[in-house]
Amino acid sequence: MILHAQAKHGKPGLPWLVFLHGFSGDCHEWQEVGEAFADYSRLYVDLPGHGGSAAISVDGFDDVTDLLRKTLVSYNILDFWLVGYSLGGRVAMMAACQGLTGLCGVIVEGGHPGLQNAEQRAERQRSDRQWAQRFCTEPLTAVFADWYQQPVFASLNDDQRRELVVLRSNNNGATLAAMLEATSLAVQPDLRANLSARTFAFYYLCGERDSKFRALAAELAADCHVIPRAGHNAHRENPAGVIASLAQILRF
């Protein structure tokens, strides 16, 4: 089994750019940014429980990494960068720390490196279980209306929230819930030590209005790019700013 993805081919000899979306997104999420790099071959992946991979269920990060590895092999991708937002960034960091043959580097936008104590994990598990229950039992429009009121999305205006609620409500609530719990921060290890000892290139992107993840970025041994005029979802709020940072990283 492999993950559903959309592949766009560029010039031979350059590494692939493999894009991983955030929770409730899909393979289209990164395309406005990714298509600015047409010289590179691009793979836009649907993570388990999302988009064309909605029917694929996993028990945890190990399963996701295994699926990602098999997907890369199926496309004969031998040399690549992982580019991930939020959940996709956490998947990218986990997979990279576990080892991926052919990995050039990891570019993470607003991805959490992991909670650092049992109390934080227990609280996160309670929270994610409550959200998962709502995703399973309530209309998605109602759930996402509350989801985007969370502090991490404080930089969004009302119109942006409404647009995201409509977009995300096309998902399957049950499969979102399953993926939310399977890849919860409550079950993700703290990756700070692994990332410090890494053998791959590591870059971190965060919006200038995303105070939480700017603080987290400062804890990581990573080259950090702050995206102007953007909050947590920087590639949606300021795609040109993210394109500029990726171009600098890739020396496009």
UniProtKB/Swiss-Prot annotation:
Keywords, ordered alphabetically = Lyase, Menaquinone biosynthesis
One of its Pfam families is: Abhydrolase_6
The EC category is: lyase
GO terms under biological process: menaquinone biosynthetic process
Which pathway does this chain act in?
Quinol/quinone metabolism; 1,4-dihydroxy-2-naphthoate biosynthesis; 1,4-dihydroxy-2-naphthoate from chorismate: step 3/7; Quinol/quinone metabolism; menaquinone biosynthesis
Q: What is its EC number?
A: 4.2.99.20
What reactions does this protein catalyze?
Answer: 5-enolpyruvoyl-6-hydroxy-2-succinyl-cyclohex-3-ene-1-carboxylate = (1R,6R)-6-hydroxy-2-succinyl-cyclohexa-2,4-diene-1-carboxylate + pyruvate
GO molecular function of the protein, one example?
A: 2-succinyl-6-hydroxy-2,4-cyclohexadiene-1-carboxylate synthase activity
The protein's matches in InterPro entries, at most eight in alphabetical order, are given as:
AB_hydrolase_1, AB_hydrolase_fold, SHCHC_synthase_MenH
Quaternary structure annotation from Swiss-Prot or TrEMBL: Monomer.
Protein's job: Catalyzes a proton abstraction reaction that results in 2,5-elimination of pyruvate from 2-succinyl-5-enolpyruvyl-6-hydroxy-3-cyclohexene-1-carboxylate (SEPHCHC) and the formation of 2-succinyl-6-hydroxy-2,4-cyclohexadiene-1-carboxylate (SHCHC).
Q: What is this protein called?
A: 2-succinyl-6-hydroxy-2,4-cyclohexadiene-1-carboxylate synthase
Q: Which organism is it from?
A: Escherichia coli O9:H4 (strain HS)
- Lineage, highest ranks first: Bacteria, Pseudomonadati, Pseudomonadota, Gammaproteobacteria, Enterobacterales
